[in-house]
UniProtKB/Swiss-Prot annotation:
Catalytic activity as recorded in UniProt: ATP + [prokaryotic ubiquitin-like protein]-L-glutamate + [protein]-L-lysine = ADP + phosphate + N(6)-([prokaryotic ubiquitin-like protein]-gamma-L-glutamyl)-[protein]-L-lysine
UniProtKB keywords: ATP-binding, Ligase, Magnesium, Metal-binding, Nucleotide-binding, Ubl conjugation pathway
Function: Catalyzes the covalent attachment of the prokaryotic ubiquitin-like protein modifier Pup to the proteasomal substrate proteins, thereby targeting them for proteasomal degradation. This tagging system is termed pupylation. The ligation reaction involves the side-chain carboxylate of the C-terminal glutamate of Pup and the side-chain amino group of a substrate lysine.
Protein name per UniProt: Pup--protein ligase
Positions of ATP binding: R53, T66, W419
Length: 452
């Protein structure tokens, strides 16, 4: 697929600390967070002017789904815009708590596990052609996705009966099968529920739910772009060595528990291979594929970072990517803190730091502290992120949705939208179906807008 549509969904962890007598349940905290949204959207499930969807998911987790993007830098900017929008709701909610005499602070974490062991996700979406063999795509992709954590995990201190352990991935402990149509009860690597949000005869949406939520822009870019490159290679029928894993679920945990990337996992054919070996093979195949087909500046940057991350893991010299890869940046931060204060990995203060890395409040979160000190690399500017809060991508269907919502709100018209429908509720027959996610211009939508 020459042009691909991408989307990213992040669920956020919510917690609240109280200094007074009055305590709120997570549900009540979520209601405070979404009060402003409900006041204008009449619902806690809304689409925004930038084409994105914002809603309260199961278990009081706010979720932000980016608009459709056909450019990965746009996608990184829109993912970060989601953080900024939620940070605004958080500041608003704290203000409202104070006005009501409740002494408390609300925290939003862009991570994947809470202290009670619950997991919430980061879901990646890649549009693929319907005519390909989805089973074959999944077969080649799963070994890549299981081992990809060593280049784009978010890192986590895992408390076990045998003591604390620093893991590469947050989600690895919570994945229970390879391919499935459920997303919550049995968390698979690839979700097969067939909801393309597009013309179902032409397209399918590959829904990857194994990944960690990333704070680092560069890690997010590497996660998405490496997967896109592997997909392109599969779509071009490039032959691959068979890395089918005997037990992907055991493998994903074993790899997460090994920062060296060297632990061997069993393959279905009886051989063994390490995460480093499997990733190197995918990288080499992608590199020679790109040498033949060409790539842009972003692609070159991603291939260089992918290569350097594998070198850092293999050599043990993690400083090579400490400014770019989440799990490494966090590990280095925790190690410095432990050395300074003489703490063990199982110390509650280390657990607190582990969590605070993911705090999206820019004056509190440790990731943002590192970024403000110039210790984390960027791929998009603050201006681009700010614009993405209100302006949809201009080259996809999201533009149509965003323009429609903006105009309907300005004209105070009652409307309903989802990923494919735009509807004015006060005119019985005024619904436009937008089945092509690549289409940013549509006369029918322009007419609908002009008629307001």
């Amino acid at each position: 697929m020459e042009r691909r549509i991408f989307g990213l969904e992040n669920e956020y962890g919510v917690t609240c600390t109280f200094r007074g007598q009055r305590r709120l349940s997570p549900d009540e905290v979520a209601r405070y967070l979404f009060r402003r949204v409900v006041s204008w959207g009449r619902s806690s499930n809304v689409f925004l002017r930038n084409g994105a969807r914002l809603y309260l998911d199961v278990g009081s987790h706010p979720e932000y789904a980016t608009p459709e993007c056909d450019n990965l830098l746009d996608l990184v900017a829109h993912d970060k815009a989601g953080e900024r929008i939620l940070e605004g709701l958080q500041i608003d909610a704290e203000q409202r708590l104070r006005e009501e005499g409740i002494a408390g602070d609300i925290y939003l974490f862009k991570n994947n596990t809470d202290s009670a062991g619950n997991s919430y996700g980061c879901h990646e979406n890649y549009l693929v052609a319907r005519h390909g063999e989805f089973g074959k795509l999944a077969d080649v992709l799963i070994p890549f996705l299981v081992t990809r954590q060593i280049i784009c995990g978010a890192g986590k201190v895992l408390q076990t009966p045998r003591g604390a352990l620093y893991c590469v991935s947050q989600r690895a402990e919570h994945i229970w099968e390879g391919v499935s149509s459920a997303t919550t009860r049995s968390r698979p690597i690839i979700n097969t529920r067939d909801e393309p949000h597009a013309d179902a005869e032409r397209f399918r949406r590959l829904h990857v739910i194994v990944g960690d939520s990333n704070m680092s822009e560069t890690t997010t870019l590497l996660k998405l772009a490496s997967t896109d490159l592997v997909l392109r290679m599969i779509e071009a029928n490039v032959p691959m060595r068979d890395f089918t894993l005997e037990n992907p679920i055991r493998a994903i945990r074993e790899i997460s528990h090994d920062m060296t990337g060297r632990r061997k996992v069993r393959l279905a054919n009886g051989r063994e291979a390490s995460a480093l070996e499997i990733q190197r093979e995918y990288l080499e195949r992608v590199q020679s594929f790109v040498d033949r087909t060409g790539t842009d500046a972003t692609g070159k940057r991603v291939l260089e970072l992918w290569q350097r991350t594998l070198e850092a893991v293999e050599s043990g010299n993690l400083d090579l990517v400490a400014r770019e890869i989440d799990w490494v940046a966090k590990y280095k931060l925790l190690e410095r803190y432990r050395a300074k204060h003489g703490l063990s990995l199982s110390s509650p203060r280390v657990a607190q730091l582990d969590l605070t890395y993911h705090d999206i409040h820019r004056d509190r979160g440790l990731f943002y502290l590192l970024q403000q000190r110039g210790q984390m690399e960027r791929v998009v500017s603050d201006l681009r992120i700010f614009e993405a809060k209100s302006v949809p991508p201009q080259t996809t269907r999201a533009r149509l949705r965003g323009e429609f919502i903006k105009k309907a709100q300005e004209k105070r018209r009652d409307f309903t939208v989802d990923w494919v429908h735009l509807k004015l509720n006060d005119q019985a027959q005024r619904t436009v179906l937008c089945k092509d996610p690549f289409k940013a211009v549509d006369e029918r939508v322009e007419k609908l807008i002009a008629g307001m």
